């Protein structure tokens, strides 16, 4: 019995103490996964991966669905081809060459298996398995699937090890055949998950499986496959709620079919919004069926959807330093990367009323767009709740004030290119400068996005990527195996703020000797800054080049520091202070009206009122209604309610 009241985080931590923590994931698992239920050939698949690279679309993991093995060529006397362990020579004549090709392209590979039918006589591994188990191979007796039989378990994993020798990195265990075994009460899915995960750690390899949820305690065996999804808005809308509430039982590393798997309908806006949710999901695995009309390649979609897809896939990879630090947090502290809003605010009723909104790590709050865009405003609407304090739009630095202790509810509107992502005042988010670089190594070039208005800190964790060094016990290894780069932000009410990056501590051998840093202060006004390294003002001998820039669109003041010794302490000062950027209300309202699908005369009247009255213009916007009185009357006016809503967000946000 767990009686914790509303102390949700404490309850989940204690549950994991009893049932086991969520293990640390390998770095590549946090990047983009390409998956499709499709009969690829070796040439076709490698060509596809090559095009992704040419188009600048980054992936770290390739998922080969069940058609890697014999399916339709199985003699009916053996049953169906649903279970299989023999590569299809028509599609993959040289499996090792194929898997080597994926590795050369920087991809780790998993393949799909349905183990229920055991190992049958048509399979290449059959003779060896039959000898191990002791069945009559001459009579072609099947090696029955039986996890309670130690001989079968030996034959089963010997077969998998032989296949892994060609280059398979981990297995997608797609069990769908119920929970019955020879031993009453023993769930085969549970045993499969346990055995495969433990086996995947042999020889010092980083353990990983990809399988279905087998009940409480399954957090010990990441990653979770949530099953086939239907391509509908309703299905998309369910996923944020599903993911965040799974954290209530400590299960954090979910992989959904991003973009939807089957049935449903084509809706390009839906696909873009699903991609955007995927970028802020625990695992971002694109997936689709074998239908020739449902491929998820971004070039299959029209602009601006195509660009939105590519941008958000790059964003996911760029977030790797942040994601990997949250990976360590999940393994050591027991906090899943996605959590419902009420975990941090259990006594505030409003935090329970936003099922589509969630925290993404320590620094971000995400409210994905899960309903179709309004055609008048050309924007998707999301109802969000922000706890007390100042918040900033992660992408453009606009400030949102929530002064009341109970927080603030508001409707926010976003174009097809992004979703609402907020960072609280003082937030610090480290990112990888080049989302197309090797995701398995610690990056040389980093961007750090810093938000004003309050003090903040962030401890970025990096490791060698070698499981032998990092070790299975993340809590024990965190000091010896990781390098920790501490970042602190002292706001000082903007009078004399300073941002500091300390020299890394711990296992500093895993950090590049020199780094390029881009420090981005978002949501601020222009200001002078001074950079100090190792206690001295920066000079040419310490760094290659220093560049300062200001982007008015995102209200971002940035400094680029090239070729900085990793052992240096970096300090950024603002001798003249640093102010919050003024809210560009008129410019943002003009953009909304420019995009709006409505009468030009109404746009002009609305903009005139906003320019003259500011926030006081809101009541008057609903009076801009005039019907055409006769055929010669060219003046008419109509103000869509959705456009008023989008304008209200801008006028009232701070």
What is each PLM-predicted segment?
Residues 375-376, 401-403, 408-412, 431, ...:
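A short local loop/turn or secondary-structure capping micro-motif enriched for an aromatic residue
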Residues 384, 388-402, 521-549:
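Proteolytic-maturation and junctional protease-sensitive modules
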Residues 423-538, 549-551, 560-654:
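Accessory, solvent-exposed terminal regions and/or long lumenal/extracellular loops of proteins
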Residues 146, 393, 463, 492, ...:
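Acidic/polar residues at beta-strand termini and the immediately following turn/coil
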């Amino acid at each position: 019995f767990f009686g914790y009241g509303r102390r949700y985080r404490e309850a989940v931590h204690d549950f994991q103490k009893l049932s086991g923590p969520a293990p640390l994931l390998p770095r590549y698992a946090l990047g983009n996964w390409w998956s499709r239920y499709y009969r690829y050939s070796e040439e076709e698949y490698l060509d596809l991966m090559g095009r992704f690279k040419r188009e600048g679309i980054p992936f770290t993991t390739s998922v080969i669905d069940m058609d890697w093995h014999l399916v339709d060529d199985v003699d009916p006397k053996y049953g169906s081809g649903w279970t299989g362990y023999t590569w299809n020579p028509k599609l993959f004549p040289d499996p090792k060459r194929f898997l080597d090709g994926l590795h050369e392209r920087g991809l780790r590979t998993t393949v799909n298996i349905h183990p229920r039918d055991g190992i049958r006589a048509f399979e290449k591994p059959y003779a060896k398995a039959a000898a191990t188990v002791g069945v009559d191979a001459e009579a072609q007796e099947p090696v029955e699937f039986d996890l309670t039989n130690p001989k079968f378990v030996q034959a089963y994993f010997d077969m998998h090890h032989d296949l892994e020798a060609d280059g398979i990195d981990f297995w997608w265990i797609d069990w769908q055949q119920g929970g019955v075994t020879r031993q009453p009460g023993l769930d085969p899915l549970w045993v499969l998950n346990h055995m495969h995960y433990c086996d995947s750690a042999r020889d010092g390899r980083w353990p990983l499986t990809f399988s279905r949820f087998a009940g409480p305690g399954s957090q010990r065996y990441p990653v979770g496959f949530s099953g086939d999804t239907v391509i509908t808005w309703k299905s998309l809308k369910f996923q944020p709620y599903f993911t965040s509430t799974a954290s209530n039982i400590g299960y954090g590393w979910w992989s959904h079919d991003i973009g939807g798997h089957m049935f449903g309908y084509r809706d390009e806006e839906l696909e873009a919004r699903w991609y955007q949710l995927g970028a802020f999901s625990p695992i971002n695995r694109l997936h689709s069926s074998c239908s020739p009309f449902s491929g998820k390649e971004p070039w299959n979609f029209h602009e601006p959807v195509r660009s939105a897809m590519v941008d958000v896939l790059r964003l996911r990879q760029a977030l790797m330093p942040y994601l990997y630090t949250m990976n360590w947090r999940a393994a050591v502290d027991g906090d899943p990367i996605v959590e419902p809003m009420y975990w941090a605010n259990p006594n505030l009723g409003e935090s329970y009323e936003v099922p589509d909104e969630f925290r993404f790590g320590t620094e971000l709050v995400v409210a994905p767009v899960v309903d179709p865009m309004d055609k008048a405003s050309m924007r998707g609407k999301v109802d969000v709740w922000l706890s007390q304090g100042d918040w900033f739009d992660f992408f453009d630095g606009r400030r949102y004030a929530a002064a009341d202790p109970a927080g603030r509810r508001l409707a926010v509107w976003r174009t097809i290119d992004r979703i609402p992502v907020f960072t609280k005042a003082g937030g610090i988010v480290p990112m990888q400068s080049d989302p197309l670089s090797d995701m398995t190594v610690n990056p040389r070039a980093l961007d750090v996005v810093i938000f004003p208005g309050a003090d903040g800190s962030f401890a970025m964790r990096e490791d060698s990527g070698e499981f032998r060094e990092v070790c299975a016990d993340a809590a024990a290894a965190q000091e010896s195996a990781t390098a920790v780069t501490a970042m602190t932000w002292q706001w000082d009410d903007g009078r004399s703020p300073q941002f500091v990056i300390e020299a890394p501590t711990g296992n500093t051998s895993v950090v590049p000797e020199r780094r390029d840093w881009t420090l981005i202060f978002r949501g601020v006004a222009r200001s002078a800054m001074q950079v100090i390294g190792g206690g001295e003002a920066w000079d040419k001998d310490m760094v290659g080049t220093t560049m300062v820039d200001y982007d008015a669109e995102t209200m971002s003041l940035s400094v680029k520091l090239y070729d900085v010794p990793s052992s240096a302490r970096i300090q950024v000062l603002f001798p003249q202070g640093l102010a919050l950027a003024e809210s560009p209300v008129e410019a943002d309202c003009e953009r909304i009206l420019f995009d709006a699908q409505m009468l030009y005369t109404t746009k002009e009247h609305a903009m005139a009122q906003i320019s003259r009255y500011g926030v006081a213009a809101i009541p008057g916007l609903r009076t801009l209604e005039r019907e055409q009185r006769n055929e010669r009357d060219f003046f008419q006016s109509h103000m869509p309610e959705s456009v008023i809503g989008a304008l209200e967000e801008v006028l009232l946000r701070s």
